[in-house]
């Protein structure tokens, strides 16, 4: 199986470190950077520290029943957290934990956390993460975009692609709530029909079928329809941090976790749909690092799994 992710736990785990105070200053620059990132909403200049924090959760070793420690010898990227210790203790009321932080240059601190936050930490610690080339994309989106803005932005993409056309009796304000998952037949730009399995919005415009298809939940948004002007002229390609906006919205809406197997195909398909002059070779060159990383992931899989993925 390819890695699966849910980004929600990233927010929960990081926020544990900033519940105490935005104003406290430590001699450890790493923690100062974390606090500054959340106080000033400056995720980009503190991005390396955020990644280091994530590496802590991945590299932490359980040293007793409720304590975790990371040593820089395990991973050279986490030097800033050498001999850093995090431990948990259940309060007498049985409804809260106390999280204790200790570390070089870091003031001893006890932070009250809820049971849900504790569970989020434990869940996050064991999670898989997306391809290395997509780390900045996910961190940017997860930390900077307000979740309340995402439905509005999705509607904006759809409206940009189809203009003022009403989708049956549905208004654009309702369109996000009509997302479905399952098998469906898709008529491509060349007129061919293929059976797909994924997320889609399906409506009728007069007598023509109209489907909005989201492949890989945010790596591409493709729009097809029975009318030529929809098939050939209405495509939306999400770039940079926008890739994960739709992905994150669907995850937050309680949708199933998503495999990354269709990532490359979706990127290629979306670019072909948006630009008839571009070639598959040019697309592969543009996304070379991502595609190479994906192939490495594939090679690490058992033979039977690789064969199955290559057939889809």
UniProtKB/Swiss-Prot annotation:
Say which domain of life the source belongs to.
Bacteria
Biological source species: Escherichia coli O157:H7
The entry's protein name is Uncharacterized protein YtfI
């Amino acid at each position: 199986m390819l890695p699966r992710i849910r980004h929600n736990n990233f927010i929960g785990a990081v926020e544990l470190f900033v519940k105490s105070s935005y104003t406290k200053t430590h001699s450890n620059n790493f923690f100062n950077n974390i606090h500054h990132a959340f106080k000033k909403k400056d995720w980009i200049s503190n991005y390396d520290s955020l990644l280091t924090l994530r590496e802590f959760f991945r590299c932490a070793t359980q040293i007793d029943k409720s304590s975790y420690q990371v040593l820089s010898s395990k991973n050279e990227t986490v030097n800033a957290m050498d001999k850093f210790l995090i431990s948990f203790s259940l309060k007498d009321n049985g409804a809260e934990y106390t999280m204790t932080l200790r570390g070089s240059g870091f003031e001893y601190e006890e932070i009250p956390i809820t049971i849900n936050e504790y569970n989020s930490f434990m869940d996050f610690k064991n999670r898989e993460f997306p391809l290395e080339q997509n780390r900045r994309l996910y961190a940017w989106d997860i930390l900077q975009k307000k979740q309340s803005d995402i439905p509005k932005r999705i509607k904006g993409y759809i409206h940009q692609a189809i203009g003022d056309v009403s989708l049956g009796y549905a208004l654009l304000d309702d369109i996000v709530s009509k997302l479905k998952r399952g098998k469906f037949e898709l008529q491509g730009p060349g007129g061919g029909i293929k059976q797909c399995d994924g997320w889609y919005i399906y409506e009728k415009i007069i007598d023509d079928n109209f489907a909005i298809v989201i492949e890989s939940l945010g790596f591409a948004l493709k729009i097809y329809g029975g009318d030529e002007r929809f098939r050939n002229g209405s495509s939306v390609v999400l770039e940079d941090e926008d890739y994960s906006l739709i992905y994150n919205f669907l995850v937050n809406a309680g949708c199933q976790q998503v495999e990354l197997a269709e990532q490359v195909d979706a990127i290629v398909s979306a670019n072909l749909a948006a630009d008839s002059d571009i070639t598959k070779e040019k697309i592969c060159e543009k996304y070379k690092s991502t595609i190479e990383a994906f192939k490495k992931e594939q090679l690490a899989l058992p033979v039977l799994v690789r064969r199955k993925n290559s057939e889809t």
